[in-house]
Amino acid sequence: MSISVMANSHLNQPYASASPTPQEKGRTCRYAGQAVRALPIRVITVGKKRSEGVRLLVDEYKIKLKPYCSFEDSLVRSNPRNAQDVRAQVEDEEVAMMKLIGSDDWVVVLDERGRDIDSEQMAELLGDAGNSGASRISFCIGGAYGHGTQVRKRANVTIRLSSMVLNHQIALVVLMEQLYRSWTILKGQNYHH
C-alpha cells in the first residue's frame, strides 16, 4: 500500500515557515487523552559514527519511548563512496535512505526549510500518522548537504526543529526528546507543561 494522500493538510506544506499564531500558543493537542494508534517509529539519520554522549542520550530516550511505541534507529553512512561532488554525495545518501523507507511508511523529513511546529503539533503529527493507515513513521535527518529530491518528494510532512541549522547528532537528540514529549502530551502525563 502506498500513502500518496497527505494525511493532514495543515502540516503537509513542505516548505511553509509559519510559526504558530498567538491563538495557537498554549493550546492543547487535539488528540490529548484519546486513543492514538501507536505506529512503530524509525529514525533514519545520515552521518558518521556517533559520539558517546549522543549514544547515551539516544539510548535513554529509546528506553523512555518503549512504553509508547517501538523504536528503530538507523544510521546511513554519510558520503558512502567518498564522492568529491556534493550532488553525487547527496544522491548516494538518498539511495541508502530510500531503501529504508517502506512503501506504506508515513515519512517526516526534517529540513531547515520545513514547517516550524510546536510540541503539541508534533504530538498531533504522531496522531495524524497513526490515523493515516501507514504501518510506520519514518523520520529522516539528512546529511551535511541535506536531502535529495526523492526523499523530499516522498515526505508526507516536512518540518524543522529549529530555524538554525543543526548537526545531525544534535537534531537526533532534539527529535528523540520531542518524540518522548509528544507521547506524554498524547497520554496526558506530567512531563510537558
UniProtKB/Swiss-Prot annotation:
The keyword Nucleotide-binding does not apply. Keywords: Methyltransferase, S-adenosyl-L-methionine, Transferase. GO terms for biological process: methylation; rRNA processing. It is an enzyme of class 2 (transferase). SUPFAM superfamilies: alpha/beta knot (SSF75217). Its EC number is 2.1.1.-. S-adenosyl-L-methionine binds at L110, G142, L161, S162, S163, M164, V165, L166. GO terms for molecular function: methyltransferase activity. InterPro entries: Alpha/beta_knot_MTases (IPR029028), RlmH-like (IPR003742), tRNA_m1G_MTases_N (IPR029026). Belongs to the RNA methyltransferase RlmH family. This is Putative RNA methyltransferase At5g10620. It comes from Arabidopsis thaliana (Mouse-ear cress).
